[in-house]
């Protein structure tokens, strides 16, 4: 996949995540690095539930279900007032090993 396809794929995963998680959790891809590291900002009331890490891991699971290796490598809890409704997820994506085609990027769960 080209860099443009990576970003398109991540945008589709972001949109699907937000559709599935509604108002409780919202994801926004904020950084994509050449080595496959992807930084995603998560906001919402999910931060007050148990299993906070699971909410972040769902982002990776949506990618895996579409043929791209992905895993959460770090969850960052911001300090200060933002901590109540925000978490940062650092993911590792392996786009190079995927066999995904452009037509496979969309789709609802």
Which residue ranges define each predicted feature?
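Domain-level signature for proteins that mediate thiol-based redox and metal-cofactor handling
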Residues: 1-109
């Amino acid at each position: 996949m080209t860099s443009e396809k990576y970003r398109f794929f991540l945008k589709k995963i972001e949109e699907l995540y937000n559709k599935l998680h509604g108002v409780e959790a919202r994801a926004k891809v904020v950084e994509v690095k050449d080595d496959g590291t992807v930084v995603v900002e998560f906001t919402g009331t999910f931060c007050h539930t148990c299993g906070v890490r699971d909410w972040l891991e769902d982002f990776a699971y949506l990618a895996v279900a579409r043929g791209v290796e992905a895993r959460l490598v770090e969850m960052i809890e911001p300090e200060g007032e933002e901590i109540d409704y925000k978490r940062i997820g650092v993911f590792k994506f392996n786009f190079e090993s995927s066999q995904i085609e452009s037509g496979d990027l969309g789709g609802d769960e």
